[in-house]
């Protein structure tokens, strides 16, 4: 059991028989009434995001998540195939379950698969990934004076805003938490 006062971003908890990851939290102490914790949670089984309020001091179960290092192999229709790096065992995950992560996955990429009581519940990506630009407008001399940005389509289909100096074929470092451009690789 863990107190909601000890919530941290990335913590996994069990509430109402479901496994949730804390995305955001805020301790609120109103002038009148009891303090509470407002949180934004992601269901690790379904990917649904829910805002939930807990009373300060309320206890919830901490979910013990095991991780296994695996390699993303390929997409097989609506299923995505991963291989354990030690045992060479393969597992399939439905696209719906890893919808957010698919924007960053490349073939042969190493990731951690999250397991809860033997059930595969999701993919844990590294903080940043390197992706190649496949389509973007050419930068025009003088564009950078205003410090603007332009859209760029990456090899996984993800579209991010990038500085004007980025060209097709460049490899970029992308933040997997929010899908933003970090730098050139």
Curated annotation (Swiss-Prot):
GO terms for molecular function: translation elongation factor activity. The keyword Oxidoreductase does not apply. It comes from the Bacteria. Pfam families: EFP (PF01132), EFP_N (PF08207), Elong-fact-P_C (PF09285). The keyword Protein biosynthesis applies. It is found in: Cytoplasm. SMART domains: EFP, Elong-fact-P_C. NCBIfam families: efp, PRK00529.1. This is Elongation factor P. It comes from Geobacillus kaustophilus (strain HTA426). The gene is efp.
């Amino acid at each position: 059991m863990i107190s909601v006062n000890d919530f941290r971003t990335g913590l996994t908890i069990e509430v109402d028989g479901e496994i949730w990851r804390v995305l955001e939290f805020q301790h609120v102490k109103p002038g009148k009434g009891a303090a509470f914790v407002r949180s934004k949670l992601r269901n690790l089984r379904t990917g649904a995001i829910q805002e939930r309020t807990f009373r300060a001091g309320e206890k919830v179960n901490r979910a013990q998540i095991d991780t296994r290092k695996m390699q993303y192999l390929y997409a097989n229709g609506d299923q995505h195939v991963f291989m354990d790096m030690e045992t060479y065992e393969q597992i399939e995950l439905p696209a719906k379950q890893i919808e957010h992560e698919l924007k960053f996955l490349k073939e042969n990429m190493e990731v951690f698969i999250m397991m809860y009581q033997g059930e595969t519940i999701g993919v844990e990506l590294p903080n940043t990934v390197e992706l190649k630009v496949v389509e973007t407008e050419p930068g025009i001399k003088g564009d950078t004076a205003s410090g603007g940005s332009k859209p760029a389509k990456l090899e996984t289909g993800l579209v991010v805003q990038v500085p004007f100096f980025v060209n097709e074929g460049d490899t970029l470092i992308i933040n997997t938490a929010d899908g933003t451009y970090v730098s050139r690789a």
